Amino acid sequence: MTIIKGNRCDWEVVIGLEVHAQVISNSKLFSGASTKTYDALPNTQVALFDVAMPGMLPVLNEYCVYQAIKTGIALSCKINKYSAFDRKNYFYPDLPSGYQITQFYYPIATEGKIVLEDHDMKEIRIARIHLEQDAGKSIHEFDKTYIDFNRAGVALMEIVSEPDFRSIEEVAEYLKKLRMILRFIETCDGDMEKGSLRCDANVSVKPVGSSELGIRSEIKNLNSIRYVMQAIEYEANRQVNALENGEIVTQNTLLFDVTSGQTRVIRTKEDAHDYRYFPDPDLFPLKIDDQYIDHVRSSLPELPMQKRERYTNDFSLSKYDADILSSDKDVAIYFEKVAEKHDGKLAASWITGELFGRLNRLGITIGESSVTAEDLIQLLDLIVNNTISGKIAKQVFDMMFESGKSPALIVSEHGLKQVSDENALSVIVERVLKNNASKVVEYKQGKEKLFGYFVGQVMKETQGKANPDMVNSIIKQQLEN
C-alpha cells in the first residue's frame, strides 16, 4: 500500500484500470476490412461500414466473440449466456458514425480476477470484459488535423478492474501478468508501443482508514507500463497537494505528458448518462450456450501459472528459473523441446544463462535466435557424451551464433574434441606436477587449494580440451603416490 504523508492526514491511493486489448483477428469487429493496419498507408484498410457510409450495416465477426470468451475463461471470469451491443453516443472527428458500438448493459464476461503473487497473493477483481470498436486516429500537423480510419472498427476487448490497487507496484505486476496471459492464449499481441494494448487509469486518494472513496480522475491512453506508473504517481501527489491546500478535486479526463511528467486536463469527465447508451438496433443479442463455452475452454493452452508449477514439479527448477521460462510462450516452447531430450536443469541453465546472455547483447528475441532448440540439443549431446567439455561448449556456442553451423561440424573443423585418453592425460599431469614440484610439496603440507591450480595448468596445456573429471581423478591419484 502506498501512503502519501500529508499535514492534515496521511493519504491512501486508490486505483482502477481499464485495459483496451486489440483482438487478434484477420478482420474487424463488424466489417471485413483487414486488421493489418500498423504499417499500412492511411485509409487503405477501410470498409464502407467503418466510415459510416449510408446504408452500411454491421456484420458481427464471430471469431472476435470466440477470442473474448477465451480471454474471459483465462481470467477466471463468468461467461454470460446473454450479452448485447449498445451505442455509445459522442462526437469526435475520428468516429464518423457519431457513436461507438460497445457493450454497456450486458458485457460478455464478468467477475474475473488476477492474483498478484509478488504482493501476498492479492486478488485484483476484474469487473467486466466487453467487446467494442476502436476509433480512427487523429494526426495533428501544424494547424491541420488529418484522420486515418485504418484502425476504425478494429475489435477491442476492454478489461475493467475494480478499484483494488493500492500502489503502482501492484499495477505494474497486474499489467505484466495480464499481457503475459493474453500473449499465451493469443487473443492480443500485447504490443503497447504499437497501441495493441492501451491503459486508462482511474486515480483517487482518500484519508487512510476512510471507507469513502475520493473523486477520481481518469488518465487516458497510456502506452507503456512505465508511463502508467509515472502518471499515477504524479496524479496521486497532485490530488493530495490540492486537498491539503483546501482545494476541490474535480472529476476530469486527463492526458499524461511524458516529456514534462505531468497530467493535463483534456475535458471534464462525463458520466454514463452523457453518452446516451441504448441497444444497437442493427445487432441481435448474443446467446452463448454451455456447449460453446466448453468448446472454447478446450482450446485454451496451458497457462503461464500452470507451466511454472509444472516446471518446478517435473524438472525441479527454482522459482526464478521457472518464472523466466514460463513467462514467454516462445521461450517455454524452446525450453520444453530441449528438456524433452536432456535434463531440465541443464536445459534451463543453458537457456537462462548462455542463450539469454547472447540474445540480450544482440537485442533480439528467442524467435530471432540463429541457434534453434534442435541446435542446443545437439550441443548438449556433445557435453553429455563427453565429446566436449562445458568450457569448450561455450566457445562452440559462440561460433554457432556467428556461423549458423551445427555444433558437431564446428567441433570437427576446429579440433575441439575433448581429450579423454587416460594415458595421454597421465603424461600431461605428470609433467605439470614435475614442473611445479615446490607447489606439490606445499599441497602435501596442507595447502589443498593448490589442487585447482594443478587442474588449471593441465587445462591450459590441453587448451581446455581435457576431460575435467578424468583430470581431477588422475591428479588426485598421482598426488597420493
Swiss-Prot record:
Keyword ATP-binding: yes
The keyword Transmembrane helix appears for this protein: no
Keywords carried by this UniProt record: ATP-binding, Ligase, Nucleotide-binding, Protein biosynthesis
Pfam families: GatB_N (PF02934), GatB_Yqey (PF02637)
Domain of life: Bacteria
An example Gene Ontology molecular-function term: asparaginyl-tRNA synthase (glutamine-hydrolyzing) activity
Enzyme class, spelled out: ligase
The EC number(s) this enzyme carries: 6.3.5.-
UniProt-listed PROSITE patterns: GATB
BP terms from Gene Ontology: glutaminyl-tRNAGln biosynthesis via transamidation; translation
InterPro entries on file: Asn/Gln-tRNA_amidoTrfase_suB/E, Asn/Gln-tRNA_Trfase_suB/E_cat, Asn/Gln_amidotransferase, Asn/Gln_tRNA_amidoTrase-B-like, GatB, GatB_C_1, GatB_Yqey_C_2, Gln-tRNA_amidoTrfase_suB_CS
SMART domains per UniProt: GatB_Yqey (SM00845)
Catalytic activity field: L-glutamyl-tRNA(Gln) + L-glutamine + ATP + H2O = L-glutaminyl-tRNA(Gln) + L-glutamate + ADP + phosphate + H(+); L-aspartyl-tRNA(Asn) + L-glutamine + ATP + H2O = L-asparaginyl-tRNA(Asn) + L-glutamate + ADP + phosphate + 2 H(+)
Subunit structure: Heterotrimer of A, B and C subunits.
Primary role: Allows the formation of correctly charged Asn-tRNA(Asn) or Gln-tRNA(Gln) through the transamidation of misacylated Asp-tRNA(Asn) or Glu-tRNA(Gln) in organisms which lack either or both of asparaginyl-tRNA or glutaminyl-tRNA synthetases. The reaction takes place in the presence of glutamine and ATP through an activated phospho-Asp-tRNA(Asn) or phospho-Glu-tRNA(Gln).
Family: Belongs to the GatB/GatE family. GatB subfamily.
Protein name according to UniProt: Aspartyl/glutamyl-tRNA(Asn/Gln) amidotransferase subunit B
Species of origin: Ehrlichia chaffeensis (strain ATCC CRL-10679 / Arkansas)
